[in-house]
Amino acid sequence: MILPYDSIENESWNFRGPKAKVPTSKSQTKISHLDVRLKEAIQAGEICYYLQPIFDIPRQQLIAAEALIRWQRDGEIHLPSNGYLDRLKLIETRSPFFEIMADKRKSLRSMISLHCDIDLHFNLNSEFFQYLEKGYGLSQICGENPCFFDLSIIEITEETLSQKNEKELVTFLQGAKEAGCKIALDDFGSEHSNLKRFMDYDIDIIKLDKSLTCQLIQKSKARAVLRNLALMCGDLGVQIYAEGVECQDTSDALLEIGISIHQGFLHGKAIPVADFTRKIDEFQKGLWMIH
């Protein structure tokens, strides 16, 4: 059932109420219209998770999948504008949309567990962590099912680590680790990366940003940097994943420098959950081949 907008407590988000803000420009009008459509889409169940596989290439093993938000309408991905995902990141952290998406994460974890025991990666952007200051606990953000924590990886970006609520973030991450979650530093290399991250935060995985992965076959300096990064991660007990692997040459170059866990279009794009579960069955039968 679609909830009425009157149920939204934050008046700045109640576009039909008497206190609604009146846009002062065409760009603001477009944003307001997009926000309304996104809210309706969340409540109608059109905003859902797709899954992109993550493989250990030498072992030919499906080890994880990243949950990526998509707007699905009439069985197809809907792309209303280039910036809709940025708006969605803001909207999905507001009540009641926050609770709706939290339920989707819980259901997704339970559904995949019926087919296989692989890790699921969930990206929590900086907006989520405003809930830490409001007293929200780990179970309210991620779920109460113990298997969620044991087989889930929370992805945070370097940008998130730069937020002001560092104390609350550290407490949250410690609680997640104690509950069984792993922590991944996403888009590594896209912001101001530094070694202090490894000392201040108990990171289990770093995921190389596509911008680094793409340079590997073109720049010898990039290859040297990533080779030594892989060695350092090995010494620290931190796993290293490569995102944005789109061609065989890149995959081969990564393997040569010791980076064996790959995610990208070469090995599989993000697909609906129902399709992914069918692929799991095919993979277990040897029908889903890794390039």
Regions from the PLM with identified roles:
Residues 136-140, 168-178, 224-231, 253-256:
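Alpha-helical scaffolding segments of alpha/beta enzyme cores, especially the outer helices
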Residues 2-6, 94-168, 244:
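Catalytic core of bacterial c-di-GMP phosphodiesterases, primarily the EAL and HD-GYP domains
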Residues 63-66, 80, 151:
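Short beta-strand edge/capping elements of PAS-family sensory modules
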Residues 44-50, 117-118:
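PAS/PAS-like sensory domains
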Residues 85-94:
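Short histidine-centered catalytic/ligand-binding loop motif
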Residues 1-32, 39-42, 52, 57-61, ...:
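EAL-family c-di-GMP phosphodiesterase catalytic domain
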Residues 77-86:
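PAS and related sensory helical modules
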Residues 51, 67-69, 122:
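A structural signal for short, well-ordered beta-strand segments
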